[in-house]
Structures are given as C-alpha cells and as structure tokens.
UniProtKB/Swiss-Prot annotation:
Main subcellular location of this protein, as a coarse class: membrane
Protein name as annotated: Protocadherin beta-9
Cytoplasmic domain ranges by topology: 712-797
Source organism per UniProt: Homo sapiens
Biological process (GO), any one: chemical synaptic transmission
Keyword tags: Calcium, Cell adhesion, Cell membrane, Glycoprotein, Membrane, Repeat, Signal, Transmembrane, Transmembrane helix
Length: 797
C-alpha cells in the first residue's frame, strides 16, 4: 500500500466519517460474549449457529467468517459445528492495558445474501500480576519542626490487573512516628500518604527506615513492597511555591524530539541552600518517563520521543519542586496532544475472491473495512475504484464496504481485471492508500463453436485407397478449458438415400475427414453432407457446416468402339469404288469413353494397313478417307487397324479393325466371305465370280457404253453415301457414358445396313444410301469441311 499526497479525483466516491465507535447499527444485530484471559487455545466461547438462530450447516453453506477490527485472528470459527473458539491465549493486559472493561470487537460475515453481524468479546481479568513499586527505595527528607498530622504523598505501586485484582490497600511497617492513609484520585486510583504522628527530633534519630506494602484484592492476594528511607533535617521555614498549581499546554503530535513543551517555575522564600529548588516528576508512569524529560534546575519539560495522538491524546504529569532543606511542593501539568494528519487510511480486507464467473452481475468480490486513526477532518475518507471498470462499491455498517460487479462480465472480451481501491482522507496534506486486486473472470459456456468456413469443398480423385484423408474441417470456441474443447461429428444426411456412413468418417478430436471406400466418379460425381462441432460445456453448445465432396475423374476407362462392332461376329466390309478421288469418306470409327474431361478426349490413328499410304484417319473425328487416287494395281481387299486413344494420364487406348473392298461399280453384287471358314469362303467366292462373269459377258456389249457414262456421272454425286454399314439405332450400352462434344460420335450419326456377313446362302443387299441425321446447327460446318476435303485432308497415316 502506498501513502502519499493527494489531489481530489473526479470519480465515483463514497464519503464517510470515522467515528470512535463506528456508524449505524441498523439491521446488523449485536452479540456480546466473554472469555477469561489466559485460557488455552481452542477454548469454547459460544455456538454461533444457535446464537444466531441458523440451521445446522448454514454457516458453512454461506461462507461464514469472523474478522476483527484490527485484522488479527483472535477467534476461530468451526463453520461445520458452529462453535466459536479462541485462536490463541488472550492476555488482557497486552490487549487492553489499563482499560476496563477489555473489549475485542469483531464481525461475523455471511454471503448469499451478504450480512454482517457485529459482536464483542469481553476478556475477563484474572489475578496474574503482583503489585510492583517502580523504586525499591523512596527517600523522604522531613524537617524536624514538621507539625504532627502532616501528610506526605508516596509513590503508588503499579498492578496491570484491573478491578478487584488491582491494588486495594497499602500498609506500613510498625513504627511510632508514622501511619498510612489511603487517598483516591480523579482517575479512580488510590495513593498512599505517610502521616506524621509524632514530632521528629534530629538529635535523637537522624534517619528512619520503613517498609511500604501494596496489596491487591485477588484471591489469593498478591503484594509488593518498597523501602521508605526518612532523613530528618534541621529547621527549614519556607516551602517552595509554584507560580501555578495547574499548567495546561498543547503539543502537536508531529512535534520533533527535543521540543520544549512547557516550563514550570517555583520559588522559595528561604535563603542559601534552603532556597535552591530542584524539579522532578512525581509518581510518574512509565509512559510519561519515556515520553518526557524535565530539567531539574530550570523546570523545562522537553519531548523525549514522538507523540502519537492515536495512542495517547493527553498527559497528566505531577511535578515536584524540592528546596535544599527537603521541603517540597507539587503542581500538575496537563498536556493535550493535537492530532495531525500523519496516518493514511487503512484498508482491511475481510473477504476476497480472485475469480468470478462471467455473466454474473451483482456478485460480491470483496468485503473490506476502512479505518483512519486520525480524527476530525483528518479521519474523514473518500473511497472509490476506477470509473472505467464494471464494478462499484456499496457501503455497509461499521465502515465496511462491499466490492460488487456492476453488470455481467464477458471473459471473451476481457479475462482479467486489475482493480485499484483508493481510500483518501480529507486532512492536510491529504493521504491515500491504494489496494490492488487482480480478478480473473472464469469461463461460462456461452459461446458455441464456430467453423472457420460456413461451407467446405473437398476434392478427391476416384479410385482412392480406403481410409484416405480427404480434408479437414476446423471450428474454434471462444470459451476456455473444457468449454472450448470441440468434438466433431457427422450429422444425418438430408438425402435419405445417401449412404454417408459408408462413404466418409470424421475424427472427433481434430475434424479430419476420411474416405471409407474407393469412390467411382462414373457412379457418384459429388455429394453433400453436414458436420457438427459441439463443445464439452454444460449444457453443450454446437454448430454445423456444409461439406461438399467433388469426385475427380481418373482415367480408368479405355475408349470403347461403337462402330465398327468388335464383338467377334463377321466384320462389316466397307465398299469403295475404284474411281474414288483423294479424301473420299470410306467410313467413320465411332468410339466413346466413360471418363470425363480430357480423359474422354479421343484421338484416332491408323495403326496398321494392308497397303500403307492408301487410306488415312482424321485424328479428331475418326473419319477414314482415301489418301490418293485408286488404281487397278491396288489390291481389292484391305484390312485397316485404327488406334483410338484418350487424352488421360497415362492414356488408354482401344483398336478397331476395318475391312475395305475396292469395287469398280455398285451394280455388282458382293458378299463378304467369312474368315472363320476358309474352304467355304473359296466356294462362295467362286460362285460370285461365275455370276459376275456371266452377267458381264451378257451385258458387256449392250451396256458397256451406258454403264461407263452412268458410273462417271454418279461417281461424285453418290460418293458420300457409298459403302456404309449401319449401327442399330438405340441407347448405348449401360456401362458407357454418352459424351457430347468431346470428339466422339453423336448418337444421331447413323448408317443403314449395307451388307450382312456370315450368311451361307449368298444373300445380299445392294447399297442404299440415306441422308445422315446431323444436328441442324452443325450442318453448315459439316458441309463446309467436306467441301474442302480435296485440298486439306488432315489424314493420320
């Protein structure tokens, strides 16, 4: 705590005046208890639960504690039994000194609701001290002409006990000159006086020695003794006379050591040695002797140690003036100590909580008491906390204050507060005391976990390995401790047909997502599901986020040739007139790929040919065209192998085998021979040759000119429709994917049947060209491309 000068703050303030016995007693109750001093530690005082009318266990449930005014733990409360016990041996003389009765004031504090019960404990005295004289020997100088009945006041004995246990009587040893008289004082103390019964004669006896005994009233009684030595003097006519019987003065408590407090003066009408006056303290207490000193020759009283108004606010000192002849006189000096603002306010914490739960307004954080040992304006105080904090001070009885939360706290906004309680007095100069409290705001589960994204998009390539980590979700919770520990889970899918539990799993601790099985892009391209994040608070709070998984296509499907059919049946043979010009469309290889994207981009390449250089394949559409003019030297039958390759990594491929037959004209019937039976094929071929030869001879003469002209005229007009075989119109096989615009053939690109193979009867059909069903929007482009064939073929040889 700090003590320093003060400038008045413009903040929340609580002004109150410290009175000697405190402030209002309203509504707090008051208990009076007692205990005998010097009882052992743990001695029973009272059962507070019964005395306050509380149920068993209520003291413990309400956090009851006992605090004393001086912040010392003289008492101990057993909150389970309700017994109030002594925490140490109590010495009444140390606690209260000469003050009687000896009271210890304390408070009983309880929470829920907050209450203060005020109480006092009286420490009863026992006779544990004997009377003690400060001087073991007292010297009295008495003139021989002193009249009988003259009383001489003696030094009294000291006994720290009080009441009946204090000094009750004085006695003197047996003698024929003196007896003891007991006198009282305004303070209630008794003094011994030595009364002269018989005139003294110095010539008979110069000195006498007596024993003074002090007796207390305890049972058994205790006593103390001192020796009185009486010196008989010659005649001394005059007694010293003080200028004043009572001297009154004031001394500020901050007066420095050595300061002159007051000067007393006494005169003596005698002359010589009998007129020499000396000054001394008479029957002074130990406190007076340690605080002041007197000059025996001048009568000046000086300060020997610093004054403390809070300990002693006034002193009454008896001064004795004695002349050289042994005669003395006494006066009284009354010193009033003036208070100065030399004590900063004291802040005594009775109850303190260093932690408070957030969202808890009106919670008691601390209970403390303010004391200022000064008086008047110096004892008035102002108490406040910082104005920018959500806390306030509530005054209570007996200068107690309660520090409370003003509103609900939010740990996520601020988890720790440094509160400074400042107490300032109104003295000059102003002094203040500061007490700092560090308050931790404990967490309440008032924040749900929050995902870093409202939705997540994850990519996973098909044919993945099971238990593959495909991604993660993450959520944070602004709370702390277990309230911030997040657990992840999969929420039931909105689509009841989605087998989510067999597709993915989530790690409950870190939000990692795993694919449980291998995914197939061709079966499932994407799926959505929700994940939840919940904390471990009570009650638990949760949130959710959307996760979309996109399956990336892998090149796991080879191209599939739709035309010509590669199913092992008799091949379809393409007929090409020998009069065909370069770029003549022989046929088109049609293939599809079950993959997507570039994995389904197909390219075509002539892998093998009976006569290289005669035919070419367009790389992007699979069209097979003639590469040059045909001649009579070219073989009639050709076998082409076309490679269809996709654009995946690594690429996949398939091959298509084509059979091409070169013919002179389309009026001649032709039936392809099955390769499966070579002998039968030779017979069929011989029959065909005979028929053709017979027809040729019969019609050679009549039709040679007409046929020649007709063939030449029709060759160009019918070139696009000659030699095409059909693929049955209908849907693709179920295991294939219809891909448009990826380089494969449109479904509407069809051929009619031109020939059938595998017939043993030699049946055949003449070629019947039809118009292809092409999409309207590509018609112009197709015509344009075909029109440029003679100039740029783009063949792939």
């Amino acid at each position: 705590m700090k003590t320093r000068g003060f400038s008045f703050p413009r903040q929340r303030q609580v002004l109150f005046l410290f009175l000697f016995w405190g402030v209002s007693l309203a509504g707090s109750g008051f208990g009076r208890y007692s205990v005998t001093e010097e009882t052992e530690k743990g001695s029973f005082v009272v059962n507070l639960a019964k005395d306050l009318g509380l149920a068993e266990g209520e003291l413990a449930a309400r956090g009851t504690r006992v605090v004393s005014d001086d912040n010392k733990q003289y008492l101990l409360l057993d909150s389970h039994t309700g017994n109030l016990l002594t925490n140490e041996k109590l010495d009444r003389e140390k606690l209260c000194g000469p003050k009687e009765p000896c009271m210890l004031y304390f408070q009983i504090l309880m929470d829920d609701p907050f209450q203060i019960y005020r109480a006092e404990l009286r420490v009863r005295d026992i006779n544990d001290h004997s009377p003690v004289f400060r001087h073991k020997e007292m010297v009295l100088k008495i003139s021989e002409n002193t009249a009988e009945g003259t009383a001489f006041r003696l030094e009294r004995a000291q006994d720290p006990d009080e009441g009946h246990n204090s000094i009750q009587n004085y006695t003197i040893s047996s003698n024929s000159f003196f007896h003891i008289k007991i006198s009282g004082s305004d303070e209630g103390m008794i003094y011994p006086e030595l009364v002269l019964d018989k005139a003294l004669d110095r010539e008979e006896q110069e000195e006498l020695s007596l024993t003074l005994t002090a007796l207390d009233g305890g049972s058994p009684s205790r006593s103390g003794t001192s020796t009185i030595r009486i010196v008989v003097l010659d005649v001394n006519d005059n007694v010293p006379q003080f200028a004043q019987a009572l001297y009154e003065t004031q001394a500020p408590e901050n007066s420095p050591v050595g300061s002159l407090i007051v000067k007393v003066s006494a005169g003596d009408a005698d002359s010589g040695v009998n007129a020499e006056v000396s000054y001394s303290f008479f029957d002074a207490s130990e406190d007076i002797l340690t605080t002041f000193q007197i000059n025996p020759f001048s009568g000046e009283i000086f300060l020997r140690e610093l004054l403390d108004y809070e300990l002693v606010n006034s002193y009454k000192i008896n001064i004795q003036a004695m002349d050289g002849g042994g005669l003395s006189a006494r006066c009284t000096v009354l010193i009033k100590v003036l208070d100065s603002n030399d004590n900063p306010p004291e802040l005594i914490i009775s109850s303190l909580s260093n932690s408070v739960a957030e969202n808890s307004p009106g919670i008691v954080l601390a209970v403390f008491k303010i004391k200022d040992r000064d008086s008047g304006e110096n004892g008035k105080t102002i108490c406040y906390v910082q104005d920018n904090l959500p806390f306030f001070l509530k005054p209570s009885v007996d200068n107690f204050y309660i520090l409370m939360t003003e509103g609900a706290l939010d740990r996520e906004s601020k988890a720790e507060y440094n509160i400074t309680i400042t107490v300032t007095d109104l003295g000059t100069p102003r002094l203040k005391t500061e007490h700092s409290i560090t308050l931790q705001v404990s967490d309440v589960n008032d924040n749900a976990p929050a995902f870093t994204q409202t939705s997540y998009t994850l990519f996973v390539r098909e044919n993945n390995s099971p238990a593959l980590h495909i991604g993660s979700v993450s959520a944070t919770d602004r709370d702390s401790g277990t309230n911030a520990q997040v657990t992840y889970s999969l929420l039931p899918p909105q689509d009841p047909h989605l087998p989510l539990a067999s597709l993915v799993s989530i790690n409950a601790d870190n939000g990692h997502l795993f694919a449980l099985r291998s995914l197939d892009y061709e079966a499932l391209q994407a799926f959505d599901f929700r994940v939840g994040a919940s904390d471990r608070g009570s009650p638990a709070l949760s949130s959710e986020a959307l996760v979309r998984v996109l399956v990336l296509d892998a090149n796991d499907n080879s191209p599939f040739v739709l035309y010509p059919l590669q199913n092992g049946s008799a091949p379809c043979t393409e007929l090409v007139p020998r009069a065909a010009e370069p770029g003549y469309l022989v046929t088109k290889v049609v293939a599809v790929d079950g993959d997507s994207g570039q994995n389904a981009w197909l390219s075509y390449q002539l892998l093998k040919a009976t006569e290289p250089g005669l035919f070419g394949v367009w790389a992007h559409n699979g069209e097979v065209r003639t590469a040059r003019l045909l001649s009579e030297r070219d073989a009639a039958k050709h076998r082409l192998v076309v490679l269809v390759k996709d654009n995946g990594e690594p690429p996949r491929s398939a091959t298509a085998t084509l059979h091409v037959l070169l013919v002179d004209g389309f009026s001649q019937p032709y039936l392809p021979l099955p390769e499966a039976a070579p002998a039968q094929a030779q017979a069929d071929l011989l029959t065909v040759y005979l028929v053709v030869a017979l027809a040729s001879v019969s019609s050679l003469f009549l039709l040679s000119v007409l046929l020649f002209v007709a063939v030449r005229l029709c060759r160009r007009s019918r070139a696009a429709s000659v030699g095409r075989c059909s693929v049955p119109e209908g849907p693709f096989p179920g295991h294939l994917v219809d891909v448009s615009g990826t380089g494969t053939l449109f479904q509407s690109y069809q051929y009619e049947v031109c020939l059938t193979g595998g017939s043993e009867t030699g049946e055949f059909k003449f070629l019947k060209p039809i118009t292809p069903h092409l999409p309207p929007h590509r018609g112009g482009k197709e015509i344009e491309e075909n029109s440029t064939l003679p100039n740029s073929f783009g063949f792939n040889y």
